[in-house]
Structure formats: structure tokens, C-alpha cells
Amino acid sequence: ITNEYGQSSDPDIYVAGDLRTIHYNPTNAPEYIPLATNAVRQGTLAGINIFGNQWPEMGAQGTSAIALFGHTLAMTGLTYQRALNAGIDADYVLFEDNYRPEFMPSTTKITSIMVYEKKSLRILGAQFYSKHDVSQSANLIQNQNTLKDLAFVDMLFQPYYGRPFNFINLAAQAGLRKIGLL
């Protein structure tokens, strides 16, 4: 375990990569998540911080994705079951829609699952599945976003790239409808 700057219990020793834990944002606790993205960020920040502890880590969500048989599966943070196992009062919304407007020459379905904390509506995790590359959408929980934040957040709209309400907006709106806030 290190501090937020990568220092071990000896302030002259910095630790990065698969040798250490990282602050896991969904649970606000240290967790062992051996991913290359974490190792690269930790190593870079440790190199910077050796010269004066100036840049804390932002934590991680355990975001990953894979392409299988022409489909993208992406995930970040907690699944619903992992949230319950962690003792979090959570719920989820499952939402499916096209990623582009129907009038476009081609479109494809995106299935989204958003896991959220019931009281605060904070997004704890998400999973996405589509033929369309949805891998970067899994980064939506880094900033402690809530269903309310994501329901109407400004997203790029141009019919080639998406709908007036992005699939993330629509999934968050579905979650708010599920709990009677929309």
C-alpha cells in the first residue's frame, strides 16, 4: 500500500505497477488491479513525484474492453453483484438503443447496464455491448458522476456519430425513470 503519490512507508521508495494496490474509485478503497494502464500511469506519476510529491493519482475503475466476433464488450467499475457483495445499497438499469438515429444508412444496437448507488445515484460501474466500438464509454465514472449528471450532460451530436441524446444520456434517463425522478 502506498500513499496517493506512490510512496511506500519509506518516503524515498516509490512503488508502481503490479506490485501495489491502487485507489479503487467505486468503493473508495485500495484494491489490487493489475492492468497495464494502471502500471503506466503509476510509473509516470512516480517518476514525476520523485522530484517533490506534486501530482496525486486519480484512482482507477478497472476499466477494460475486448473485441470478440465483431462485437465490443466494455466494462468499468462494479457490476451489480460486486456492488452488493461490497455491502453497497445499489441498483442497476439495463437499456438498449441504437447508437445512431434510425434515418442513418446504418446503425446498430448498444446494450448498456449502469450500476448506481441508490441514495446518491453515483455511478458505481457500467457494462456495454455492441458491434459499435463503445470502449471509451466505460470511462464515465472517473469523476463520481451520478445518474442526474449523465442524463443531460452535453455530448457530441452529429448523426454519423450518435443520437441527439447519446446512449449514455439515454441509459441514465432510463435509470431516473426507474426510480421516478423523470
Predicted features along the sequence, with ranges:
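Flexible, glycine-rich terminal cap/loop adjacent to redox cofactors
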Residues: 71-76, 86-182
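Short secondary-structure boundary/capping segments
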Residues: 5-6, 65, 104
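Active-site-proximal substrate-binding core of FAD-dependent oxidoreductases
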Residues: 21, 29-34, 48-77, 150-158
